[in-house]
Design a protein with these regions (language model features):
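Residues on the lipid-exposed face of transmembrane beta-strands in outer-membrane beta-barrel proteins
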Residues: 116-120, 139-143, 169-173, 198-202, ...
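Detector for outer-membrane/organellar transmembrane beta-barrel domains
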Residues: 199-301
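Outer-membrane beta-barrel proteins
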Residues: 104-106, 127-129, 141, 159, ...
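Transmembrane beta-barrel domains of Gram-negative outer membranes and organellar outer membranes
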Residues: 2-186, 351-353
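Repeated loop/turn-to-beta-strand initiation elements of outer-membrane beta-barrel proteins
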Residues: 124-127, 148-153, 175-182, 206-212, ...
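Outer-membrane beta-barrel "beta-signal"
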Residues: 229-233, 294-298, 319, 341-374
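Residues that define the transmembrane beta-barrel architecture of outer-membrane proteins
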Residues: 110-114, 133-137, 163-167, 176, ...
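Transmembrane beta-strands of outer-membrane beta-barrel pores
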Residues: 97-101, 122, 133-135, 145-147, ...
Length: 374
């Protein structure tokens, strides 16, 4: 009797047999499908390059601004008293006092100013408001629709007619290898007056990006339109915490739509030392109106202090030291000498930050939170 033929089984049990799924039908009309196929091939080629987004237009030269003390220096006496009322969501109020500076009326000594501010922030919303002793009000509102899309609004209401009020609306889009932004200052839908700025940056290589800026202004019957161009070179390596490592650098060059030229260079010299250089040129037909200012600065980060030093081509030498004596108390000293005008400025300030017991308890029990859309 012949042996029975061997039995063969399928390579997969019936429940695990592979299922062939037809690709989804394209919703594009037939006559546009060649364009769709070309676009998909183009997107696949972009993905293979592995390019990262070049950063937002408004952040060009941000590292240099953080290194220099132009946005931090002051003169006279200043005190900031802050209290954190909540950690999740973040809610903080601040009382700011200033006196003795050179920003007083008619160029005299400032007799004293007071500002009250409040900040509220979540992972999707950021709100900030401030009012001073003269009644001027400023406010900001940011909303993050997604990690890649953010809408921003700001308003400034001046107490006196001499200072103009302002309203701005902005939207930022961060793509895989590009960034785009649209901004409008004092827009009027009725007659389309106002200032409108559009910017686009595109990464071409992992270390190089180019962009364009368009400016359109309309005030009454006067219209103006101009273009600007941007280039950015960078080689930034970061640690696990997101901080830049030694020898990281960023260089930018910009021909602004307003006609000015600007170039910046920033480098991480050491884990606690940053250096930055900025060159700003204002071309003009008349040699008397042509201006150029070069600024070089350095920042040292110590365990409980930060020192900034700066010198520029106009003869100004300035320095700022912020000493944090405790987590809730900081002492700041700022000074500037203008060798050309033979003038000097000096400032001293304190900052006190406190938190309620409820806020501290909530912070200890809360998990990691996403940063607000600033």
């Amino acid at each position: 009797m012949a042996a029975p033929a061997p039995a063969f089984t399928a390579p997969f049990p019936p429940s695990a047999a592979p299922v062939v799924v037809d690709p989804p039908a394209s919703s594009v009309p037939a006559f546009l499908r060649p364009l769709e196929a070309a676009y998909l091939r183009f997107e696949a080629a972009r993905d293979r390059l592995g390019l990262a987004d070049p950063g937002k237009y408004e952040d060009l030269g941000r590292e240099v601004k953080l290194t220099h003390l132009t946005n931090y220096t002051f003169d006279g006496a200043r005190a900031d008293l802050s209290k954190t009322l909540s950690q999740v969501p973040a809610f903080q109020v601040t009382h700011s006092f200033a006196a003795g500076g050179a920003a007083g009326p008619m160029g005299g000594v400032n007799p004293g100013t007071y500002n009250f501010g409040a900040v509220y922030a979540t992972s999707k919303t950021f709100m900030q408001g401030m009012v001073d002793n003269e009644g001027s009000v400023t406010g900001r509102f940011n909303y993050g629709w997604s990690p890649r899309d953010t809408t921003k609004m700001s308003v400034q209401l001046a107490a006196s007619a001499a200072a103009p009020s302002m309203f701005s609306l902005e939207h930022d889009r961060v793509g895989k290898d590009y960034t785009a932004s649209l901004k409008a200052y004092n827009p009027s839908p009725a007659d389309l007056t106002g200032s409108y700025i559009g910017a686009y940056l595109q990464s071409l290589t992992p270390h190089f990006a180019v962009g364009v800026e368009a400016l359109y202004q309309r005030q009454g019957e006067v219209e103006d339109c101009s273009l600007g161009y941007i280039a950015k070179w960078h080689d930034v390596k970061k640690d696990e915490a997101g901080a830049a490592l030694k020898d990281s650098w960023i260089a930018t060059a910009q021909v602004m739509a307003q006609g000015m030229w600007q170039a910046t260079y920033w480098k991480k010299l050491a884990p606690s030392i940053d250096a930055g250089v900025d060159l700003l040129c204002v071309p003009a037909l008349s040699p008397r109106d042509r201006k150029a200012v070069a600024t070089a600065g350095v920042k040292y980060d110590f365990r409980t202090a930060t020192f900034r030093g700066q010198v520029d081509s106009t003869g100004k030498v300035s320095a700022l030291l912020e000493q944090r004596l405790s987590p809730a108390f900081a002492f700041t000293v700022a000074g500037e000498i203008d060798h050309i005008k033979n003038t000097s400025k000096f400032g001293v300030g304190v900052a006190i930050d406190s938190a309620s017991e409820e806020a501290m308890a909530a912070a200890m029990n809360a998990g990691p939170q996403a940063p607000p859309p600033i």
